[in-house]
């Protein structure tokens, strides 16, 4: 049973601290910390994609405040694999925290190097590539790894031996015994379990899905069938990070005597990096530039593109809008959607499919009758298998929303793990591991989300987002008042409204607001005394705002963003 920490019971004991900067009670921005005495190691540093209501925001990363405050303790960052929700925050971390070394698998290391090169103010000290056989030590920690099967090659779980017990972080994983390729290293997991795993931090993304997930082998078979039977061009979209599937699709295309055209920056980048480090063996003669596809018969072309999530600027959406410079859709085209919409993208994907349908193209989506996508995350029986292999003393669910975390607690109980030994945490909540036992410490670090806009990150963006959300819902109302040097109001205040209500249809209300503002301001100037000019301006703005707010709420039931401009001539 996980108990509350009582300091009086552990005088002179130094705990191993376990906490999440992000990734708990959410899907995205995975980042976890393990601390002992004067050392902190970090596992992953990801980004979370912004929902539609976060207007103008490109992504969300964890707060690095705790690491900035404890800079001297930071010893290393360990990356489990190269997906954005695990590496997307790295350049922003390196702008604020001096990380001595980053340990990462091959493809993740290459992707990180490229990302950092795009952020000139990010300081990268050293990147060390690790594999299945790597071992690293700091003063207090011993770290090694086990390979997992995921939707990107070179994916790993991380094992950390600490003075108070052993911690395993699962990474993203699944079991796929049929597809071949990189298998989850069951033998290594068993060896790690023999050490006694005190805390298992396990991903929960697909914890609500029963059974075993579909094998990629079935996905390849179905894609091959569609490509083989297509009489025109095939346009296939999938996640650009799903390197394993992309490699297989290219092989299928070549076997069906089709040239492959890569469209979309992330698709092009990921394939080129994979070829460079030897994860893909592709003959350059099988790849064609988009400007050259017109020189080939339609049935000899497969376009592999971005846009599976309905992204506005992605290649497939550009085609659907008829705006692509080189590709115009035809009724003879076959579109394959080898993906599922991630939460928040359903509407965008449906809009994309509707636009594509207007061209009369043939569209294949992932469905129970035609499996074209398999998740890279463990479902219920796979989680049971992993829990039985590791059989930890304590379980901390990560990488999932609360309901997913709650579900894996039930799964763990079926595997013989006591429900009281499962810690359902929040980001920032610190657990103490002492002599192999886990405690709720009561300590909390800052884990506020930090918003990214045009590669800039700042806590202040939260206020900007709130203003944008008010603007989108309630509109804006501006008051402009001009005074002479004796503080007399010149003329009447000017009112401007945008997105709040139509001013021409509300002339009596606008007149009432104008006169009320003028009377209120004159009353302030005539009857109040101020020590400073700043105090007077603050009071004048307050009167303007409260007057506008009162009348608009009373008459329109709106609460717009109110801006006041006062000037003296």
From Swiss-Prot:
PROSITE patterns: UPF0036. One of its GO terms (molecular function) is zinc ion binding. It holds the Pfam family Lactamase_B. It is an enzyme of class 3 (hydrolase). Keywords: Cytoplasm, Endonuclease, Exonuclease, Hydrolase, Metal-binding, Nuclease, RNA-binding, rRNA processing, Zinc. The keyword Phosphoprotein does not apply. Zn(2+) 1 binds at residues 81, 83, 150, 172. Binds up to 2 Zn(2+) ions per subunit. It is not clear if Zn(2+) or Mg(2+) is physiologically important. One of its GO terms (cellular component) is cytoplasm. GO terms for biological process: rRNA processing. Zn(2+) 2 binds at residues 85-86, 172, 399. Substrate binds at residues 373-377. Its cofactor is Zn(2+). InterPro entries: Metallo-B-lactamas, RibonucZ/Hydroxyglut_hydro, RMMBL, RNase_J, RNase_J_2, RNase_J_b_CASP, RNase_J_bac, RNase_J_C. It is found in: Cytoplasm. Homodimer, may be a subunit of the RNA degradosome. This is Ribonuclease J.
